[in-house]
Amino acid sequence: MSRIATSPAVLRQLLSASLRVTPAGSVEILDAAQLRQSGAATIAWTAAFSTDEATVAAAQWLARATAVAAGIQSASIAPLYAARANGAYEWLTVPALNLRSQVFEMSRTALETAAAMDGAALIFELARSEQTYTFQRPADYATSVLCGAIAAGWRGPVFIQGDHYQFVAKKYATDPEGVAAEIARACRLAVDAGYRNIDIDASTLVDLALPTVQEQQRVNAVRTAEAVALVRELEPAGLEISMGGEIGEVGHQNSTAEELAAYLDEFDVALASRSAGARGLRKVSVQTGTSHGGVPLPGGGVAEVALDFTVLKELGELARARGLAGAVQHGASTLPEDLFHRFPEVG
């Protein structure tokens, strides 16, 4: 039976049949079946619901250490994206799941389903805005996902992502450096929590009133490059955190090839000036007709989406020609099931 521990000592006692902490500070799994059945939930629920900070910290540490003992790694998806960019894979699409509640249960179910269909390329992500209203810091979210992986009996990489680390345009207009500092802090917290994938969204800063596409995308590219350069300083030695950018604010007009090319050109210049030789982006999110949450209708339904797969295909090909894995379709959660097969078709 899963329980919420009231202290680190009680947590160790509740888990004593499932695992032990060795004198060297690692975790040894004693009963894998019991760990999956109840131990992982005890760690997850204690981390989420305990009111004692030391107990929460102990549960978060146990989640990371137990995951390692179980053969689970919070991993960067950059190697897979690099292989896609090099043409090693076709017909590949990577769904990203924004789990806002019941994260332990939902990540477990998602990974059990993936294992049953011999799948592994899926991302668990949470946006900065979602962190706020769901009261989940990166460390909280990573703990729940890793515990879900343990409960699922998963082995191998788990991709956890900071989604939409977004520059809020209204705040940026009056305090640009303050907003940039917020994004930098978010990146630091994500890396510290074990996130190995982060998406920066400065597309809100695009100014379509400027005369050229390069000028329109410049602030977007520069602020994204600043964040990428910071993450390159923070990432562990020998590991590349997968970084994403964005050119089309979701829910607004469709992106174009000219915009993507201008953004990547401006980004490359900005990154080189801050961190010469640093690895840049692995993907770029674009807008092709969706909006987050869909467009609600008066009767309670959701309007059909006029999704432009031609645009997605064109931008994906351009992105791969520039060494990226492709283009990312945001706001797909409300799309009808009969459209999802199109994503690997168009790349």
Question: What name fits each language-model region?
Answer:
Residues 52, 103, 134-137, 212, ...:
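Helix N-cap and loop-to-helix transition residues
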Residues 175, 211-213, 342:
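Hydrophobic alpha-helical membrane context
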Residues 98-102, 127-131, 161-167, 203-205, ...:
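Active-site beta-loop-alpha junctions enriched in small/polar residues
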Residues 83-88, 118-123, 205, 238-241, ...:
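Short amphipathic alpha-helical segments, especially helix-boundary/capping motifs
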Residues 1-46, 59-75, 183-184, 191, ...:
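Active-site capping/gating regions of soluble enzymes
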Residues 95-96, 122-138, 167-170, 200-218, ...:
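Glycine-rich, proline-tolerant flexible connector loops at the mouths of alpha/beta enzymes
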Residues 1-179, 186, 195:
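Alpha/beta catalytic barrel-like cores
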Residues 118-120, 156-158, 191-202, 279-283:
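Short coil-to-beta-strand
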